[in-house]
Design a protein with these regions (language model features):
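Catalytic-site signature of metal-activated, phosphate-bearing donor transferases
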Residues: 53-61, 86-274
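Active-site-proximal specificity loops/subdomain of glycosyltransferases
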Residues: 25-77
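Conserved acidic residues
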Residues: 13, 73, 81, 106, ...
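Residue-level signal for alpha-helix termini/capping positions
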Residues: 9, 68-69, 97-101
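Acidic donor-binding/catalytic loop of UDP-sugar-dependent glycosyltransferases
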Residues: 25, 74, 78-95
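Acidic ATP/Mg2+-coordinating residue in the GHKL
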Residues: 19-25
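Short, well-formed alpha-helical segments that are part of the catalytic scaffolds
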Residues: 1-16
Length: 274
């Protein structure tokens, strides 16, 4: 979470962080990131919403409500396992200025890289979303949607967005195999509820098997500056032979169409590009 917050800090006047009721030092870690820019919203997670990831959107909306009360034109959203790459800062600030007063534009659409197993590989099959909204107008009619992957406005209406040449790095699948399995076990309750989690916890599932993946490619570009120390401290290995990728016929067709047209055809879009 530290790197996530640091990655957006240069673009923000204030960063509002929703911190749940915990005793693991998270609140102290967040508060220490910046002496004046950090504002913490203390929350209690509603376990009655532990189904289909709804509780994640509920927590997001708590922070959004605090952000709506500010006089900012734009709100940047980042999740704890995401990092905004500084290479996109100029494009983001230009887009913010250009579309600030355009009432048709609800938000800005960013590109995604999903890292998997280690910081050396990104997932490339079609079920990993290629884009998502991470910057929205300060509009109280906008809210976090379903499992907090994206946003809606009004009566379940998709947001109108402008694409921006900037990348969010998603590192949620880069952990020690044992830590990854523990995360998966803990995360089950947000979709299946506490009762299911109790049964799940009785079983020692060992280490997470990262080899069960259909398609990866090597990442050879720089990571965000805020990630450098974390990457240096890596103490596990994950090696994958990209020649063994098992892309489905569906994915092969989508990739071919993308090369020919430059558009991601037949993929679900949680937004409207205008």
């Amino acid at each position: 979470i530290k790197e996530a917050i640091l990655s957006i800090l240069p673009l923000c006047d204030e960063v509002i962080v929703a911190v749940g009721d915990c005793t693991d030092g998270t609140r102290e870690l967040v508060q220490a990131i910046h002496p004046t820019k950090i504002k913490i919203i203390d929350t209690v997670w509603n376990t009655a919403l532990n189904r289909d990831g709804i509780v994640l959107a509920d927590e997001t909306n708590k922070a959004l409500q605090a952000a709506f009360a500010t006089n900012s034109h734009w709100l940047i959203y980042i999740q704890g396992d995401e990092v905004l790459h500084e290479d996109g800062f100029a494009a983001i600030t230009q887009a913010m200025e250009k579309h600030k007063d355009d009432k048709k534009v609800d938000g800005l659409l960013l590109n995604y890289r999903h890292f998997y197993g280690s910081y050396d590989y990104i997932a490339t099959s079609s079920h990993w979303y290629k884009n998502e909204i991470r910057i929205i107008k300060n509009n109280v009619n906008i809210y976090s949607y379903k499992d907090a992957q994206g946003f809606r406005k009004g009566d379940n209406e998709k947001l109108n967005v402008k694409p921006v040449d900037a990348f969010v790095h998603h590192y949620g699948w880069v952990k020690k195999p044992k830590t990854m399995m523990n995360k998966r076990k803990e995360g089950v309750k947000f979709w299946e509820g506490e009762k299911y989690t109790e049964e799940y916890d009785k079983t020692d599932l060992g280490d997470y098997d990262f080899s069960q993946i259909d398609s990866l490619e090597l990442y050879k570009k720089p990571h965000p500056q805020v990630m450098q120390q974390r990457i240096i401290n890596v103490n596990w290995k994950f090696n994958y032979d990209v020649s063994f990728n098992k892309k489905t016929l569906k994915d092969q067709l989508k990739n071919l169409l993308f090369k020919l047209t430059g558009k991601r055809l037949f993929e679900y879009q949680n937004y409207k590009i205008i």
